[in-house]
């Protein structure tokens, strides 16, 4: 989020008020022995490389929040955005997500390398809107009061519609 005010809460830095709001309302209540929360972890999405004797830079993706279960499995990768607009055709169609082309590319590279969906989220007054970007079949736009859902269940629903 460009030109956003950087905030600090409990010693952690947040890129925007929306991101902090998402953390306080949806993530903080989950923190326990069963779930481990990671803020702004770095994932390599393109390794460094040699180019005519020069070293090309690696590329990293930094999601806003990653949640792992007690076994250490990643169960959510969240990227907080300012806006997700429903498709005029309905919530089952691809919604409009406003982000830079660079952000879109990084998300696609992350999903390709790690096989994990990046959940694009926007906290609203009472709910959080969520979609996944970059897939050939849209999972649509979903709204949740809590983030206790399993993204794999949504994949199964979409897969059964194919």
Task: Report each predicted region and the residues it spans.
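Electrostatic, structured charged patches in enzyme active sites and in nucleic-acid/phosphate-binding
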Residues: 1-162
């Amino acid at each position: 989020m460009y030109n956003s005010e950087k905030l600090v809460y409990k010693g952690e830095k947040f890129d925007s008020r929306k991101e902090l709001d998402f953390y306080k309302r949806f993530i903080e209540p989950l923190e326990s022995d069963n779930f481990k929360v990671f803020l702004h972890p770095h994932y390599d999405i393109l390794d460094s490389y040699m180019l005519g004797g020069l070293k090309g830079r690696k590329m990293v993706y930094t999601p806003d929040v990653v949640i792992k279960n007690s076994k250490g499995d990643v169960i959510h990768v969240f990227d907080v955005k300012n806006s997700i607009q429903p498709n005029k055709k309905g919530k089952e169609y691809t919604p409009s997500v406003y982000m830079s082309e660079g952000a879109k590319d990084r998300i696609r590279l992350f999903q390709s390398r790690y096989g994990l969906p990046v959940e694009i989220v926007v906290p609203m007054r009472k709910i959080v809107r969520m979609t996944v970007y970059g897939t050939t079949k849209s999972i649509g736009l979903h709204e949740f009061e809590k983030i206790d859902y399993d993204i794999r269940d949504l994949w199964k629903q979409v897969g059964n519609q194919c």
